[in-house]
Amino acid sequence: MFSIRKIITISDYVTMLNIITGLLAILLNSFSLIYLSIIFDSLDGYVARKTGTVSDFGAELDSISDVVSFGVAPAYLLYNNFESNLALISAIIFCLCGALRLARFGILNVKGFIGLPIPAGALLLVGFCQLINSYLINSILAILIGLLMISDIKYPKYPNKIFIYIFAVSLCLAIVGIPHFALMLCLIYAIYGIIKYIRGD
């Protein structure tokens, strides 16, 4: 018998915190909880590697949690805060692109990322939604971000450590209502991949 109780690990509990914060972001209409989900998403892999608990089960759970926290939740926040037919359509497109991106990631064994990672896509969307009070602009951005996620653009998996530390601080600021720095760093990351792709690197 397949017993979840016997195979679940400490890193899986961290992943479940990602799911919980993603769900709460929807229920409470909270942008800040998306940033907290990103922190948990970063920590679960780190904990799994440090504790030697990397598993197929954990990978599947992580993928499901990402759909909730970085696909469904940002899409809901877009529509709920900018109610319009265009926001509805773009929210659906964003969520579908995120799911497709995760499905592709699950079957590829490559160094780095193909397409913008969905946590980065979620950060971009919620950051723009917080700072730009326009359903039209945010709806268009949601579609563009979705297309970036399913593109063939390559992105580095682990930027240098200094970037990671700065990004961690920026996420903490975003959680307390200052998303500007996290959005700027993520935008640089997204543009970096586009420039390298155009140059053929």
Swiss-Prot record:
Pfam families: CDP-OH_P_transf
Cell compartments where the protein resides: Cell membrane
Topology of the protein relative to the lipid bilayer: Multi-pass membrane protein
EC code(s) of this entry: 2.7.8.8
Record's GO cellular component terms: plasma membrane
Secretion signal, residue range per the UniProt entry: none
Keyword Lyase among record annotations: no
GO biological process: phospholipid biosynthetic process
GO MF terms, alphabetically ordered: CDP-diacylglycerol-serine O-phosphatidyltransferase activity
Transmembrane residue ranges: 19-39, 57-77, 88-108, 112-132, 133-153, 162-182
Keyword Repressor in record: no
InterPro entries: CDP-alcohol_PTase-I, CDP-diaglyc--ser_O-PTrfase, CDP-OH_P_trans, CDP-OH_PTrfase_TM_dom, CDP_ALCOHOL_P_TRANSF_CS
Reaction catalyzed: a CDP-1,2-diacyl-sn-glycerol + L-serine = a 1,2-diacyl-sn-glycero-3-phospho-L-serine + CMP + H(+)
Keywords annotated in UniProt: Cell membrane, Lipid biosynthesis, Lipid metabolism, Membrane, Phospholipid biosynthesis, Phospholipid metabolism, Transferase, Transmembrane, Transmembrane helix
Superkingdom of this protein's organism: Archaea
NCBIfam families with a match to the protein in the record: pssA (TIGR00473)
UniProt family annotation: Belongs to the CDP-alcohol phosphatidyltransferase class-I family.
Name of the protein: CDP-diacylglycerol--serine O-phosphatidyltransferase
